[in-house]
Amino acid sequence: MPLKIEDLKPTPGSRKPKKRLGRGIGSGLGKTAGKGHKGEKARGRGKIGRTFEGGQTNIIRRTPKFGFSNAPFKKVYSVVNVETLEKYFSENEEVTPDILLEKKLIKKLNDGVKILGKGEISKPLVVKANIFSQTAREKIEAVGGKIEVIE
């Protein structure tokens, strides 16, 4: 007898009938019907939204939708004061970002070095940096030092 598609049947025991919920204790899914006791998930409202955070304002509403922050693009300069140059460098010595890093006066170069005018300076130095404050520029040039802006 040839095998026909309409004669095919599932193997006995391979297909179980679905369990009907809430149809008595004997069914195994009576009383609470697999929903546990009380609580929001046991009620008839279904699932909680994926953005629900228990009543606090959710992150989607908290985050700004407009505007722009330039923080990731800002330039960060390593700062050195004039008083530091006075303390660690001798007369007519050249000061460069690499020398400052070597002497551990700055932790890292970042986007460059900025010289600020805190303190006093009494000896002329040749200072090479990316940016100088107005007071630092005046103090270095007043004692006969030279300033070179590097890019």
Curated annotation (Swiss-Prot):
GO molecular function annotation: rRNA binding; structural constituent of ribosome
Residues covered by region (Disordered): 1-51
Cleaved signal peptide residues: none
Cited InterPro entries: Ribosomal_uL15, Ribosomal_uL15/eL18, Ribosomal_uL15/eL18_sf, Ribosomal_uL15_bac-type, Ribosomal_uL15_CS
GO CC, any one term: cytosolic large ribosomal subunit
Protein's job: Binds to the 23S rRNA.
Protein name: Large ribosomal subunit protein uL15
Organism (species): Petrotoga mobilis (strain DSM 10674 / SJ95)
Biological classification of the source: Bacteria, Thermotogati, Thermotogota, Thermotogae, Petrotogales
The gene coding this protein: rplO
